[in-house]
Protein backbone atom coordinates (compact mmCIF):
# COMPACT_ATOMS: atom_id res chain seq x y z
CA UNK A 1 0.00 0.00 0.00
CA UNK A 2 2.88 2.39 0.74
CA UNK A 3 4.18 2.15 -2.84
CA UNK A 4 0.80 2.97 -4.35
CA UNK A 5 0.36 5.95 -1.99
CA UNK A 6 3.59 7.47 -3.40
CA UNK A 7 2.43 8.76 -6.78
CA UNK A 8 5.97 9.49 -8.05
CA UNK A 9 7.18 5.95 -7.30
CA UNK A 10 3.97 4.46 -8.75
CA UNK A 11 4.48 6.41 -12.00
CA UNK A 12 8.08 5.18 -12.23
CA UNK A 13 6.99 1.55 -11.73
CA UNK A 14 4.16 1.99 -14.26
CA UNK A 15 6.65 3.24 -16.89
CA UNK A 16 9.15 0.45 -16.15
CA UNK A 17 6.38 -2.17 -16.20
CA UNK A 18 4.74 -1.07 -19.47
CA UNK A 19 1.64 0.59 -17.96
CA UNK A 20 0.82 3.79 -19.90
CA UNK A 21 0.77 6.81 -17.59
CA UNK A 22 0.76 10.55 -18.28
CA UNK A 23 4.14 12.24 -18.55
CA UNK A 24 5.04 13.86 -15.24
CA UNK A 25 7.86 15.39 -13.25
CA UNK A 26 8.48 15.19 -9.51
CA UNK A 27 9.41 18.22 -7.43
CA UNK A 28 10.45 18.52 -3.80
CA UNK A 29 9.58 21.54 -1.66
CA UNK A 30 12.15 24.26 -2.39
CA UNK A 31 12.91 23.13 -5.96
CA UNK A 32 12.22 25.66 -8.69
CA UNK A 33 9.40 25.06 -11.15
CA UNK A 34 11.03 24.18 -14.50
CA UNK A 35 10.36 26.53 -17.43
CA UNK A 36 9.47 23.70 -19.83
CA UNK A 37 6.27 22.49 -18.12
CA UNK A 38 3.44 22.14 -20.67
CA UNK A 39 -0.04 23.38 -19.79
CA UNK A 40 -2.73 22.47 -18.98
CA UNK A 41 -1.30 20.24 -16.27
CA UNK A 42 -2.32 18.57 -13.03
CA UNK A 43 -0.45 19.24 -9.78
CA UNK A 44 -0.71 16.45 -7.18
CA UNK A 45 0.68 15.99 -3.70
CA UNK A 46 2.70 12.75 -3.94
CA UNK A 47 1.01 11.09 -0.98
CA UNK A 48 -2.51 12.50 -1.10
CA UNK A 49 -5.72 10.50 -1.39
CA UNK A 50 -9.37 11.27 -2.23
CA UNK A 51 -8.17 13.94 -4.71
CA UNK A 52 -6.99 16.11 -1.80
CA UNK A 53 -4.03 18.23 -2.91
CA UNK A 54 -4.89 17.84 -6.63
CA UNK A 55 -5.12 20.97 -8.80
CA UNK A 56 -5.81 21.63 -12.48
CA UNK A 57 -3.57 24.43 -13.79
CA UNK A 58 -3.61 26.29 -17.11
CA UNK A 59 -0.45 28.40 -16.86
CA UNK A 60 2.71 29.01 -14.84
CA UNK A 61 1.06 31.43 -12.37
CA UNK A 62 -1.70 28.90 -11.56
CA UNK A 63 0.96 26.19 -11.26
CA UNK A 64 3.02 28.24 -8.75
CA UNK A 65 -0.12 28.82 -6.65
CA UNK A 66 -1.12 25.12 -6.86
CA UNK A 67 2.39 24.04 -5.82
CA UNK A 68 2.16 26.21 -2.69
CA UNK A 69 -1.20 24.61 -1.85
CA UNK A 70 -0.03 21.04 -2.62
CA UNK A 71 3.06 21.51 -0.43
CA UNK A 72 0.68 22.02 2.51
CA UNK A 73 -0.16 18.29 2.13
CA UNK A 74 3.25 16.88 1.22
CA UNK A 75 6.88 17.91 0.67
CA UNK A 76 6.86 16.16 -2.72
CA UNK A 77 4.56 16.81 -5.68
CA UNK A 78 4.03 15.65 -9.24
CA UNK A 79 3.23 17.92 -12.16
CA UNK A 80 1.53 15.71 -14.70
CA UNK A 81 0.37 16.15 -18.29
CA UNK A 82 -3.39 16.79 -18.32
CA UNK A 83 -5.28 14.14 -20.28
CA UNK A 84 -8.57 15.47 -21.65
CA UNK A 85 -11.14 12.76 -22.09
CA UNK A 86 -13.22 10.17 -20.30
CA UNK A 87 -12.47 8.98 -16.76
CA UNK A 88 -12.65 5.35 -15.67
CA UNK A 89 -11.97 3.21 -12.64
CA UNK A 90 -11.08 -0.47 -12.65
CA UNK A 91 -11.22 -2.49 -9.45
CA UNK A 92 -8.83 -5.42 -9.18
CA UNK A 93 -9.35 -8.15 -6.58
CA UNK A 94 -6.61 -10.78 -6.13
CA UNK A 95 -5.12 -9.91 -9.52
CA UNK A 96 -8.37 -10.08 -11.52
CA UNK A 97 -9.95 -6.96 -13.03
CA UNK A 98 -13.61 -6.22 -12.30
CA UNK A 99 -16.02 -4.58 -14.76
CA UNK A 100 -14.94 -1.03 -15.63
CA UNK A 101 -16.87 1.95 -14.29
CA UNK A 102 -17.00 5.29 -16.13
CA UNK A 103 -17.16 8.42 -13.98
CA UNK A 104 -18.67 11.55 -15.50
CA UNK A 105 -18.74 14.47 -13.03
CA UNK A 106 -21.78 16.66 -13.50
CA UNK A 107 -19.47 19.67 -13.12
CA UNK A 108 -15.72 20.13 -12.78
CA UNK A 109 -13.59 17.04 -12.28
CA UNK A 110 -13.76 14.06 -9.92
CA UNK A 111 -12.48 15.87 -6.84
CA UNK A 112 -12.98 15.31 -3.11
CA UNK A 113 -16.46 16.87 -3.15
CA UNK A 114 -17.62 14.88 -6.19
CA UNK A 115 -16.23 11.62 -4.73
CA UNK A 116 -18.30 11.76 -1.56
CA UNK A 117 -21.44 13.64 -2.54
CA UNK A 118 -24.16 11.37 -3.90
CA UNK A 119 -25.56 12.67 -7.19
CA UNK A 120 -22.49 14.73 -8.15
CA UNK A 121 -21.36 12.22 -10.80
CA UNK A 122 -22.95 9.89 -13.32
CA UNK A 123 -21.36 6.45 -12.92
CA UNK A 124 -21.89 3.75 -15.55
CA UNK A 125 -20.92 0.16 -14.76
CA UNK A 126 -20.06 -1.68 -16.84
CA UNK A 127 -18.69 1.25 -18.87
CA UNK A 128 -19.84 1.62 -22.47
CA UNK A 129 -16.65 0.54 -24.26
CA UNK A 130 -16.09 -1.95 -27.06
CA UNK A 131 -14.68 -5.33 -26.10
CA UNK A 132 -11.13 -4.57 -27.30
CA UNK A 133 -10.89 -1.35 -25.25
CA UNK A 134 -12.44 -3.07 -22.23
CA UNK A 135 -9.90 -5.91 -22.39
CA UNK A 136 -7.02 -3.45 -22.92
CA UNK A 137 -7.96 -1.32 -19.89
CA UNK A 138 -8.53 -4.38 -17.70
CA UNK A 139 -5.14 -5.74 -18.83
CA UNK A 140 -3.41 -2.48 -17.86
CA UNK A 141 -5.25 -2.46 -14.50
CA UNK A 142 -4.05 -6.01 -13.76
CA UNK A 143 -0.52 -5.10 -14.90
CA UNK A 144 -0.49 -1.97 -12.69
CA UNK A 145 -1.67 -4.09 -9.73
CA UNK A 146 1.18 -6.51 -10.45
CA UNK A 147 4.00 -3.95 -10.92
CA UNK A 148 3.00 -2.25 -7.65
CA UNK A 149 3.07 -5.64 -5.84
CA UNK A 150 -0.48 -5.28 -4.55
CA UNK A 151 -1.81 -8.51 -3.03
CA UNK A 152 -5.43 -7.93 -2.01
CA UNK A 153 -7.52 -5.34 -3.83
CA UNK A 154 -7.14 -1.92 -5.41
CA UNK A 155 -8.85 0.60 -7.62
CA UNK A 156 -6.93 1.83 -10.66
CA UNK A 157 -7.92 5.20 -12.15
CA UNK A 158 -7.64 5.82 -15.89
CA UNK A 159 -8.19 8.60 -18.41
CA UNK A 160 -8.86 7.88 -22.08
CA UNK A 161 -8.38 10.60 -24.70
CA UNK A 162 -10.32 11.11 -27.94
CA UNK A 163 -7.89 8.77 -29.77
CA UNK A 164 -8.86 5.99 -27.30
CA UNK A 165 -5.35 6.06 -25.79
CA UNK A 166 -5.57 5.15 -22.12
CA UNK A 167 -3.42 6.34 -19.24
CA UNK A 168 -3.29 4.94 -15.72
CA UNK A 169 -3.32 7.89 -13.33
CA UNK A 170 -2.82 6.06 -10.05
CA UNK A 171 -3.67 3.11 -7.85
CA UNK A 172 -5.70 3.31 -4.68
CA UNK A 173 -5.13 0.41 -2.29
CA UNK A 174 -7.49 1.89 0.30
CA UNK A 175 -10.50 2.60 -1.94
CA UNK A 176 -13.66 3.97 -0.41
CA UNK A 177 -16.27 1.50 0.74
CA UNK A 178 -19.19 3.92 1.12
CA UNK A 179 -22.48 3.41 -0.77
CA UNK A 180 -21.28 5.92 -3.44
CA UNK A 181 -17.78 4.35 -3.71
CA UNK A 182 -16.64 2.82 -6.99
CA UNK A 183 -15.07 -0.53 -6.01
CA UNK A 184 -18.23 -1.84 -4.26
CA UNK A 185 -20.30 -0.85 -7.34
CA UNK A 186 -17.94 -2.72 -9.68
CA UNK A 187 -17.79 -5.74 -7.38
CA UNK A 188 -21.60 -5.88 -7.11
CA UNK A 189 -21.81 -6.37 -10.90
CA UNK A 190 -19.71 -9.53 -10.36
CA UNK A 191 -21.83 -10.68 -7.41
CA UNK A 192 -19.43 -9.62 -4.63
CA UNK A 193 -20.98 -8.16 -1.47
CA UNK A 194 -18.95 -6.34 1.21
CA UNK A 195 -21.73 -6.13 3.82
Language model: regions and residue ranges:
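Phosphate-binding site of ATP-dependent enzymes
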Residues: 58-139, 160-167
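Short, intrinsically disordered, charge-balanced linker/junction segments flanking boundaries
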Residues: 1, 22, 191-195
